[in-house]
């Protein structure tokens, strides 16, 4: 069973919320008090909620389900990318494109284009083109990879979303809600918990806190997969077959 403890959360600064004047009253029940006009999150509430979310993710991973990691703001992107890669999960770290879930058919066409360009860049096609055309395709490849590289092997809609900063990723949450995809989210004192199925009340800005959330989630995925007897790389290997089955 994947678990975090109080000490880890305190060390990472999970308890530091936002300035009191920016608070969202819907988060009131998770606030312990205030210090120097900063809300302090009640970690006695966060701890069981965080561990419930980890157990949920572990169970999903044990059933070979896909958890999409989402964190596009500057402080989160790099950590999201690294931890998703470590556990072989899909991720969005740059920008959420509207319709990434609700208009997946269009997204799938863009992923197909990304794969074609990747092949062309490796099989010598680019070298046979004019300098201008090769440059244009290289730029297209770079742009598509930045936006869709993290989900190109997803092979269909995810079974859950894990989101850092629910306000920043509100479009992703709305899309998941429309499709009935469960959402796990880190919710700070200035954010609304609406649309989040598994709320983790906590600091969504501090790099150490983000590292704790992402590391624990990646560990839960790895543990779930190993319990199911599946390899971490399974997601990457199975994806092309799943994608063709979708089409």
From Swiss-Prot:
InterPro entries: Ribosomal_uS2 (IPR001865), Ribosomal_uS2_bac/mit/plastid (IPR005706), Ribosomal_uS2_CS (IPR018130), Ribosomal_uS2_flav_dom_sf (IPR023591). GO terms for cellular component: cytosolic small ribosomal subunit. PROSITE patterns: RIBOSOMAL_S2_1 (PS00962), RIBOSOMAL_S2_2 (PS00963). GO terms for molecular function: structural constituent of ribosome. The keyword tRNA processing does not apply. SUPFAM superfamilies: Ribosomal protein S2. Keywords: Ribonucleoprotein, Ribosomal protein. One of its GO terms (biological process) is translation. Belongs to the universal ribosomal protein uS2 family. This is Small ribosomal subunit protein uS2. The gene is rpsB.
């Amino acid at each position: 069973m994947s678990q975090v403890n109080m000490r880890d959360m305190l060390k990472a600064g999970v308890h530091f919320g936002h300035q009191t004047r920016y608070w969202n009253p819907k988060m009131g029940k998770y606030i312990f008090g205030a210090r120097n006009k900063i809300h302090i999150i009640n970690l006695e509430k966060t701890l069981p909620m965080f561990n419930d979310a980890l157990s949920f993710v572990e169970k999903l991973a044990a059933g070979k389900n896909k958890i999409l990691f989402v964190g596009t703001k500057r402080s989160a992107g790099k950590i999201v990318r690294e931890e998703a890669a470590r556990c072989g999960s899909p991720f969005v770290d740059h920008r959420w494109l509207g319709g990434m879930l609700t208009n997946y058919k269009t997204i799938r066409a863009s992923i197909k284009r990304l794969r074609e360009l990747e092949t062309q860049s490796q099989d010598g096609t680019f070298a046979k083109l004019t300098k201008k055309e090769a440059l244009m395709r290289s730029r297209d490849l770079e742009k598509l990879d930045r936006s869709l590289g993290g989900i190109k092997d997803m092979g269909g809609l995810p079974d859950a979303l894990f989101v850092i900063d629910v306000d920043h990723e509100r479009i992703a949450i709305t899309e998941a809600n429309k499709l009935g995809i469960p959402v796990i989210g880190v919710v700070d004192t200035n954010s609304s918990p609406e649309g989040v199925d598994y709320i983790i009340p906590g600091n969504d800005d501090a790099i150490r806190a983000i590292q704790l959330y992402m590391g624990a989630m990646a560990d839960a995925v790895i543990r779930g997969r190993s319990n199911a007897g599946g390899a971490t790389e399974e997601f990457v290997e199975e994806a092309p077959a799943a994608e063709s089955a979708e089409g």
